[in-house]
């Protein structure tokens, strides 16, 4: 009976580990966005968001929210192995995974519509107001 208990605990532990699996991979991110650059001047306004290609796993989204600047990897947190890049909704409040239909809030990266259950991968945003630029890194 003791061995049965140990076997059940081990079986549960092994199967639970498999469910933790799919997360957005860690990649080095470190770049500067000049807010004077015409591609990014909209970020001066609260409620704006832009995409930046060639960084992160599937690109980066940078947004100016009521709580400040945020940055997320565009790689969907739902089935990230598919590398589906989320897109910014017209209202600039949500992003959508075109592969699954999942949605996340830009404000904090939390899931807003199933099947997503994990938040978007966030990056750190440093603001240098005197030089008018943002640094995004991890």
Predicted regions and their residues:
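Sec-dependent bacterial lipoprotein signal peptides
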Residues: 1-17
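N-terminal pre-ligand scaffold of iron-sulfur
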Residues: 18-91, 105-106, 119-138
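Short cysteine-rich clusters marking metal-coordination/redox-active sites
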Residues: 76, 96-97
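Acidic, glycine-rich flexible loop segments
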Residues: 112-113
